[in-house]
C-alpha cells in the first residue's frame, strides 16, 4: 500500500508476532483514511493466510445486533452451526483471525468475545473503527492509529493510479500536486480524484480545472 508500508509492517507484526494469548488489535482513524483497505491487505497477505488456520471477515453495521453478529461469524467460520458453542467448538485448537470491519457504533465485538477460545496459540481479533474509546476498551496496548498521508505519499498514490509506468509529465506535476493537496491526505479522496483523472486521460489532465475536481471530492 502506497504510504502505508510502515503501518502494514506493524500490523503484520501485531498479528503474527508477540504474545500467543488471544488478543484484540484495533485499527483506528477517521473515515476515509484506509482502515478497511489496510485490514484487507493484511487479511489477504500470504503471511496471514499461511499463519492462521481459520480466517473470517465480518462487517459490523450501525444496526447490527449481537445475534446478527454471531450469525455472520457462524456463516464465516463453520457451516450449519446454530449456537455460540458451535463457534467455540469449531475454533478450539485452531489458530484463527476474525476481522470486525467498521465496528464504530457499539462495542458488539466485546459482547461476543466469549465465542472465541483462547488456546494461547496466537489467535487474533482485529477491529477497524473510528472510535478511540472502543480501541481502548478492546485492548489498550494494541491500537494502530492511522493518520493522513503526507503530500509526498499522496502524490505517489495519485501518480500510481493515473500515469502509466508511474511517470507523470513534468508539465503536469504542479497541477497534479495542487489537486492532490485538496484531498488533505485522505486515501479515499485521492482514490476518487485518481478515478476522475484516469477517466479523463492524461492528455486531458492539463485542461482540468482545480475547482471542478475539488468540488467532486
Where are these regions (language model features)?
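N-terminal flanking helix/linker immediately upstream of nucleotide/cofactor-binding cores
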Residues: 1-33, 37-46, 50, 61, ...
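A conserved switch/coupling segment of P-loop NTPase cores
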Residues: 41-51, 85-149
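Surface-exposed loops and adjacent edge beta-strands of modular extracellular domains
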Residues: 17-19, 48, 105, 187, ...
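Non-catalytic, charged helical/coil tracts that couple and regulate nucleotide-powered enzyme cores
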Residues: 73-81, 85, 121-123, 131-217
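Intrinsically disordered, low-complexity regions enriched in proline, serine, glycine
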Residues: 23-24, 37, 50-52, 67-70, ...
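Short, acidic/turn-prone active-site loops that include or flank metal/cofactor-
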Residues: 26, 30, 62-63, 130-132, ...
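A short hydrophobic beta-strand->loop->alpha-helix junction that borders the nucleotide-binding pocket
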Residues: 55-64
Amino acid at each position: 500500500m502506497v504510504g502505508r508500508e510502515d503501518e502494514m509492517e506493524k500490523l503484520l507484526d501485531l498479528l503474527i508476532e508477540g504474545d500467543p494469548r488471544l488478543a484484540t488489535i484495533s485499527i483506528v482513524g477517521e473515515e476515509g483514511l484506509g482502515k478497511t483497505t489496510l485490514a484487507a491487505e493484511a487479511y489477504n497477505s500470504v503471511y496471514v493466510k499461511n499463519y492462521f488456520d481459520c480466517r473470517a471477515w465480518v462487517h459490523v453495521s450501525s444496526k447490527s445486533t449481537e445475534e446478527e453478529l454471531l450469525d455472520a461469524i457462524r456463516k464465516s467460520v463453520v457451516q450449519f452451526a446454530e449456537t455460540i458453542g458451535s463457534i467455540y467448538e469449531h475454533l478450539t485448537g485452531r489458530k484463527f483471525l476474525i476481522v470486525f470491519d467498521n465496528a464504530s457504533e457499539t462495542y458488539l465485538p466485546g459482547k461476543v468475545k466469549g465465542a472465541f477460545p483462547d488456546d494461547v496459540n496466537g489467535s487474533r481479533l482485529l477491529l477497524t473503527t473510528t472510535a478511540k474509546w472502543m480501541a481502548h476498551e478492546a485492548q489498550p496496548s494494541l491500537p494502530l492509529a492511522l493518520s493522513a498521508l503526507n503530500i509526498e505519499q499522496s502524490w505517489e498514490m495519485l501518480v500510481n493510479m493515473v500515469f502509466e509506468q508511474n511517470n507523470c509529465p513534468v508539465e503536469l506535476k504542479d497541477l497534479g500536486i495542487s489537486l492532490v493537496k485538496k484531498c488533505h491526505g485522505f486515501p479515499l479522496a485521492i482514490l476518487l480524484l485518481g478515478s476522475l483523472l484516469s477517466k479523463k486521460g492524461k492528455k486531458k489532465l492539463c485542461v482540468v480545472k482545480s475547482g471542478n475536481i475539488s468540488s467532486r471530492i
